[in-house]
From Swiss-Prot:
Protein name: Short transient receptor potential channel 3
Transport keyword on record: yes
Extracellular side: 466-496, 551-594, 662-701
Disulphide connectivity of cysteines: none
Gene: Trpc3
MF annotations from Gene Ontology: calcium channel activity; calcium-activated cation channel activity; inositol 1,4,5 trisphosphate binding; metal ion binding; store-operated calcium channel activity
Means of activity regulation: Activated by diacylglycerol (DAG) in a membrane-delimited fashion, independently of protein kinase C. Activated by inositol 1,4,5-triphosphate receptors (ITPR) with bound IP3. May be activated by internal calcium store depletion. Inhibited by intracellular Ca(2+).
Cytoplasmic side: 1-447, 516-528, 619-637, 728-909
Transmembrane segments: 448-465, 497-515, 529-550, 595-618, 638-661, 702-727
Compositionally biased tracts (Acidic residues): 19-28
Low complexity bias (residue ranges): 58-67
Amino acid sequence: MSTKVKKCREPARVTLPAPEEEDGEAEGAEPQRRRRGWRGVNGGLEPPCPRAPPSPGPDASSEGSPSRWRTAGMRDKGRRQAVRGPAFMFGARGPSLTAEEERFLDAAEYGNIPVVRKMLEESRTLNVNCVDYMGQNALQLAVGNEHLEVTELLLKKENLARIGDALLLAISKGYVRIVEAILGHPGFAASRRLTLSPCEQELRDDDFYAYDEDGTRFSPDITPIILAAHCHKYEVVHLLLLKGARIERPHDYFCRCADCAEKQRLDAFSHSRSRINAYKGLASPAYLSLSSEDPVLTALELSNELAKLANIEKEFKNDYRKLSMQCKDFVVGVLDLCRDSEEVEAILNGDLESVEPLERHGHKASLSRVKLAIKYEVKKFVAHPNCQQQLLTIWYENLSGLREQTIAIKCLVVLVVALGLPFLAIGYWIAPCSRLGKILRSPFMKFVAHAASFIIFLGLLVFNASDRFEGITTLPNITVIDYPKQIFRVKTTQFTWTEMLIMVWVLGMMWSECKELWLEGPREYIVQLWNVLDFGMLSIFIAAFTARFLAFLQATKAQQYVDSHVQESDLSEVTLPPEVQYFTYARDKWLPSDPQIISEGLYAIAVVLSFSRIAYILPANESFGPLQISLGRTVKDIFKFMVLFIMVFLAFMIGMFILYSYYLGAKVNPAFTTVEESFKTLFWSIFGLSEVTSVVLKYDHKFIENIGYVLYGIYNVTMVVVLLNMLIAMINSSYQEIEDDSDVEWKFARSKLWLSYFDDGKTLPPPFSLVPSPKSFVYFIMRITNFSKCRRRRLQKDLELGMGNSKSRLNLFTQSNSRVFESHSFNSILNQPTRYQQIMKRLIKRYVLKAQVDKENDEVNEGELKEIKQDISSLRYELLEDKSQATEELAILIHKLSEKLNPSALRCE
């Protein structure tokens, strides 16, 4: 086979049957035409081997000239080999192209501006919408190779199709100038041209987008602005936003509207993919930066929405999590670009000027964005140095100099506050607006006061049990009374002074929790697990004291009966009614449901929960904070593990009980003979405290005994070797995750603790918070007054807006809002932007510039080299065209000159 035939097949990159030998000896004329013009022969494809060209004569066209062959050979070795070469997977349905169309597509692909211009101007039979076997027309080929001049020439044709496809291609490659040229086409003047997806426009429109049944380069639901957002093309997104393009946020996942139901019914997968594509566009930093008036708030809310979708749509969990993290990184990136405290405060507080004065009155630093970031667990944003520095400044507010003091000085301050807490509370009640009041209202002092109050509460709990540290003097079967007619239960149910103080503290803490529940709302209150722990602890305390009080009331009634009906001095000689006699019994004869017994059990649980609440203040310390976080994560792992543990435990507990339930009294020990004994044996065997003889029978029933040995052995292997080691591995993994990012985790937990003391209120800790201060009454009256004033102002404004002389102002405001909707760009969001909007505009400019610089630094040189090659290719064709024109002009001049010099010779001829 000849070399030329191999060269002919090589660009097509398909495997073809070997042609006849005489075909291989042919030399290729018009190689480009043969390379493109494939025809079906006998149901197959005709191999792209050129037939022997006709011998060039004096009248041969330029297409058959050797220079034409060389040009075609160079193109065969060019950068787009086999682009239009067919392959069997595309079938034989591709349209046949004429020589003119072949030449036109070649010129558009390689940037031959003179040829394209000439054919568009002179040719009458040229089909500008002709496509190659891949379905690409001349406009797409020109756009794909970044030939701006060719694109502009093609866009001047009135009947040009698939302009939308070319726009998507230009956006994907980042050709901004070509995008501008295409957007200037009259076809984009139609309403909603940029907002509808190609699939929707194909159903209601012409061939602005042309999608075949085999699919194309882009998904049918991709709009130009979605694609630009996916590719992070800031300039393109800006252009499209100016044209009115927007990304519509998908409906809620559980939406049951007619549109969503129809899409879900037709193709659930396509519906899900279209939602992901839309969210990818919405979560793009380019779209967030340029489309939103408040990008930080938009990104925070979108990150939370995407995190929820990750838990709902499990099949696309990783995609949604990645997008959620992308939104969080955007917020952190904007915060990182702050250069002064004003910019940091703007991001952390949000637009305070848009908040009502009544809501803004409380504290100058609302920290609304920080609260939102904590709620949505944007940990890197909260732990960022810029945010932490601002929070630390607020933490030591009104305490100048304490921030720079040593730990010893701070500990001394804590001790002084703890010892002088009652006096500080009295001083605050008397003069809440004095210097002392301002100091006590600082977040640090509020934290110290509450911590000191809680430590005093724990001290009371310990002191209440101190009389029993070395044991009790009265045995459970002995009753001790103060005087002969006294009922024993009256003595045991009386409240001591320490218990009364504990009750006062509990009431104070419950009052604080109720106020917090009222201010935050039930939903926000329950989300914080510490609130659930506090409420549960206090509820158990109240239940314990209530049961104790009921027992005291019953004993008091019995004592009243004795005092009024019994005349004897010794109750042991008197027959009392059963309901009264019961209260004279010793502890060993009390019923299990006795209120005092229930009270003591609940009180013990509440004490345990009270001491566990110390972990709430541990994040304030850098050493103990990460440990507390690891402990919390470990508890979560244990709860997850308990599901599998309980399943295995119940299986073996019931199985062993069924096996040995018939052998009660016939075993070495009572293990597994009852459900209770089965539970005890299996539970303590986890810690190695159960004996192997638990399965041994006194009878010679070896089969049952052997089954017991096997089941007991399998249980120990499963629980001890497998499940417990799995739990240890889970705990180790969780601890390692915290340790790897301990600084961020600790700062996030510390910020949550700090933030609970930043808001106004909670100045005095329990139980001092039970007594309302004069300031509370003043603030209550001020709030009522401000509320009535604001309501009067709103009514007055409504009346003014309803009058005819204010219609012009209303129209101006409406026009301003419409301009805001049409251009979310760098220019001006409002005619008179607020200070917050000015700062956000400045930060977004920095972010966009930084993103563009980073992209330029990350770009590979291959793209630049390709662009240079394409420019050189276009320049080559222009130079060749200029050379051809110069040659023709020179030939004409020579001919005219020869006519003048040799007129006689020409006449003779």
